Amino acid sequence: MKDHAVDHGFHVHDERHFVETYSLNQVWEVDLHPEEGCGGPLDLHLALEVDPRVLLAFEDIVVDLPDDADPPDDFHFPLIFTWALPPLPSGPDLLRLAIDLAGVGRVDLPLEVSAIDSYPAATDAPERRLTIVARQQISLSKILQGEEPICDVLDRCLAVSQWLLDAAPSWLSD
């Protein structure tokens, strides 16, 4: 996944792999941003969650299939993209932002836009932190058949990232 993201114009800063000892659930996380955004205000966090029960159930189905049969498309892993920006002195209107980003993400990449206003001290002005989340389901059947369209998702994520990088300077100014 990390190498694939690099092929689509992203620069990787960090990667992590977690295994929960009780359930054996695993999460692969990658921190990245567009190549032109190095040193910029935008962070993108990618997380792939692997449930071993889903993987084992998929394996059971595949083992019992005839050689020429395709497995059912019932087994998926969540892939989550989370964009974050630093506190924004002149934060955007959230509804306008959600509408604008819907045009960038299109139907292929539905985006959730949220913000948190916090007060560092009672006498300080509020700080608005912006978060955008996209959730995708990665089909194990399509991966097995070599058809998983992750390229389209990464291209949409790059477009969203570039749009946010272009818009961020106006939100960061006082």
Which residues are covered by each model-predicted region?
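N-terminal interaction modules that seed assembly of large macromolecular complexes
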Residues: 6-65
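Generic structural hydrophobic/aromatic packing signal, biased to beta-strands
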Residues: 10-12, 30, 46-48, 79-83, ...
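Short, charge-rich amphipathic segments
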Residues: 24-35, 80-95, 162, 166
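A general secondary-structure signal for short beta-strands and their flanking turns/coil
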Residues: 25-27, 39-43, 74-78, 125-133
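Catalytic micro-motifs at enzyme active sites that drive phosphoryl/nucleotidyl and oxygen chemistry
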Residues: 33-35, 65-70, 117-124
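C-terminal basic regulatory modules in eukaryotic proteins
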Residues: 41-108
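Glycine-rich, aromatic-bearing surface loops/beta-hairpins
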Residues: 89-174
